[in-house]
From Swiss-Prot:
It is an enzyme of class 4 (lyase). Its EC number is 4.3.2.1. This is Argininosuccinate lyase. Pathway: Amino-acid biosynthesis; L-arginine biosynthesis; L-arginine from L-ornithine and carbamoyl phosphate: step 3/3. It comes from Bacillus cereus (strain ATCC 10987 / NRS 248). One of its GO terms (biological process) is L-arginine biosynthetic process. It is found in: Cytoplasm. The lineage of its organism: Bacteria, Bacillati, Bacillota, Bacilli, Bacillales. Keywords: Amino-acid biosynthesis, Arginine biosynthesis, Cytoplasm, Lyase. It catalyses: 2-(N(omega)-L-arginino)succinate = fumarate + L-arginine. Pfam families: ASL_C2 (PF14698), Lyase_1 (PF00206).
Amino acid sequence: MSKLWGGRFTEEAEAWVEEFGASISFDQQLVNQDINGSIAHVTMLAKQGIVTKEEAEKIKIGLQYLLEEAKQNKLHFSVEAEDIHLNIEKMLIEKIGEVGGKLHTGRSRNDQVATDMHLYLKEKVEHIIKATKQLQTVLVHQAENNIETIMPGYTHLQRAQPISFAHHILAYFWMLERDVNRYEDSLKRINISPLGAGALAGTTFPIDREYSAELLGFNGMYENSLDAVSDRDFILEFLSNSSMLMMHLSRFCEELILWSSQEFQFIEMSDQYATGSSIMPQKKNPDMAELIRGKTGRVYGNLFSLLTVMKGLPLAYNKDLQEDKEGMFDTVKTVEGCLHIMAGMLETMTVNKEKMGQAVTQDFSNATEIADYLANKGLPFRQAHEIVGKLVLHCTQKGIYLVDVPLATYKEMSSLFEEDLYEVLSPYAAVKRRNSAGGTGFEQIEKALEKAKGLTKEVIKN
């Protein structure tokens, strides 16, 4: 077929060269955005008198037809037409005649593709925000059911201090809230229009960029035409935000994987989110959590790939920028899928409250309570720390825990110890007392839950 840009050329490219340079295999995902952008563009052209109202109406009817065909997956794309833009233009001309060729007046594929991607990411980021909020509601529900579920808190993966399981869950709620905030802030930069920037220098036609931006729901437009067609910051920001979100999901999945093991037994995954072994009949593997953890590296890779593409590009458009789309599409699909799986996995998991409770009665995570006990009686904390360290050593040598140590032995270490010491050794009491703002104390968790519910109330309504 003859190329829409073929006037300059006397030889046709080899078939394998065409295939190598074509992007239609993946940028066809922008079909809705491309057609909607074209409808806005031709509407603006008619308003400005650049095309007649009759021509614009004919073009819009043709575009609406193609849009309906696209929604029903009836469009057939060709590698020969290279990309989504030329495929749609070719189909339009075939449908309505040569007047379809006027659609591209005052526009380049450079500003066209940038517009498509802005529209695409605007829609997808809003979907991801909603999915993240839905995951947050699951976390809130689990936290509500586990306020007084006591578990070991860890540092260095060693038992550190007893905490409420709800407190641990809500830590991830607030991580996700920051992710939501980043996505929401990024919409300020996504929701601006490059349409009308042309190839790089604007156009000689009397276009109205503000009008076309308004038609497409953009809040503004790029101030510089070179920047408009060269910018991929908005995609990089999306990939960066998605990498952080996936990092948070991955960290949680790592803990879920550990907790579901025989060594912990803190939780059990629903059969819906676990798999078995082809050789070992007893196995119940946390495959979904492992996949989310694994797919995090995939999203990181998409970010680093585009950063590497962009680092050496002069202004304005270069064919390298064709490589900006597959990683973006892949990240959208990956993040949406992981959020959906994560929500279902957390909603259906069984929390083994008894096992968690046993864990904090058979360790030394209450050691800090004794140090605080002595400090509250006036002993410098560093001295209290030393005394309790010796008590822990004594216990490990005897094969006992702090609650088993007789008062007489405590008094040998410090005369400040009294019978009330044993009250502070209770893991439940230890958690309850940590009532500083943002702490694991039950009152603080109730306050945190109220805030969390306020941030997810719109999702809960829907």
